[in-house]
Amino acid sequence: MNIFQEPEHVSMLRNTLRQFIDKEMPRDKVNQWDKDDHFPRDVFDKLCKLGVTSLTVPVEYGGSGRDMMATIATIEELCTRSLGIASGYIFCACYAGLNLSEVASEEQKQKFLPEVANGNLLFSYGISEPDVGADVASVKTKAVRDGDEVIINGTKRWCSGPNVTDYIYTIVRSGAKEDRYKNLSIVLIPPSLEGILIEPQQTLGQKGVGGTCDVTFNDVRIPFENVIGGEDGWNDGWSKIVSTGLDVEKIEVSAMALGIARAAVDDAWQYSQERIQFGKPICHNQSVRHMLAEVKTKLEACRLMTYQGAWLADQDVIATVEMSMSKLFVTETALDIVLTCQRILGAYGYVRDFDMERYVRDMLAMPILGGSSAIQKNNIANRLNLPK
């Protein structure tokens, strides 16, 4: 593939999404969603009618076939306007669609994937805990089998969207503590079940994504059929959580950062031509011109790394190093891009009358999501066999 030439169907998808964004996601509405911390499910449902949630679902389950280039392009385009709508898309197409396609049992695929393709099934992630971040294998949330049911007890932290999703895709300890990596399972837990307490956390940015929450499970019962992989998946959750799904999550975050950074550059570029000081637009000043040239260049580098990752994902190859490199470089660079664009706007980049301050708030989380930058550096060094 020529990485410098986007496939025609992806370019057509971009045009469709941009028309949708202009019509259904105008800036004033998006700003209000942000202020109200509101997830507009009606707009999300309209988005799903475009067929974009089918991009991660195999044809035999009602989808259009796995297409990561198109999926990543969808995330990027949506993030140029609304991280909330983009998050809803990720909850459906990626958290549900990609994971179910990769590691679910045949019965689970037949049951759930057609719903994903139609945009009717959203997953939250229940992975992190109050004392568990990067060391996922040390989770303490416990699952005990009781006949045809599983009883769940414990607490998950940084669970995005449980107020709007249908299931929490939850990793639990189902075996003896000593059997690290062989005592974990993944279960699907409906957030509405008795015994579940959802406590929203106040965050700086990422508003309108259904909330970032603590979720506590107190003797919550689910049917055993909700264990991902069925009988074979019990105590085999580690192999599923470290499958290619987590690698792909890295470029999902890269695409989010790329979309936000692109919006920031576009706004700063336009502002520099409209803002008049000393009788001329500020884009005539060399210092501003250099800042804009720099962010444009960095943005292009981010784009290339993001879509290289998407292309590798479409080749169905293990690309852990490349995915970590993309996530590390793109999120850190995109953060620098947005902060530079904020400086171009001066005080206007700090007030809610302009979108720039929202870009800053949303971007600050990107180097943390999907594994922090420090973790990505560890992954890269370890995978490249750098001696410890």
Protein language model features and the residues they cover:
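Amphipathic, small/basic residue-rich leader segments at the start of a protein or domain
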Residues: 1-90, 110-111, 115-118, 384-388
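Glycine-rich beta->alpha junctions and the first turn(s) of the following alpha-helix
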Residues: 2-8, 12-13, 80, 198-300, ...
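Glycine-rich phosphate/cofactor-binding loops in nucleotide/flavin-utilizing enzymes
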Residues: 2-3, 73-74, 95, 241-247, ...
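C-terminal helix-coil-helix/basic helical segment that borders enzyme active sites and/or dimer interfaces
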Residues: 28-35, 269, 273-283, 296-329, ...
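N-terminal glycine-rich flavin-associated loop
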Residues: 87-107, 133-136
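A short, Trp-centered hydrophobic/proline-enriched beta-strand micro-motif
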Residues: 119-127
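A structural signal for short hydrophobic beta-strand segments in well-ordered beta-sheet cores
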Residues: 141-144
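A short core secondary-structure module
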Residues: 149, 153-201
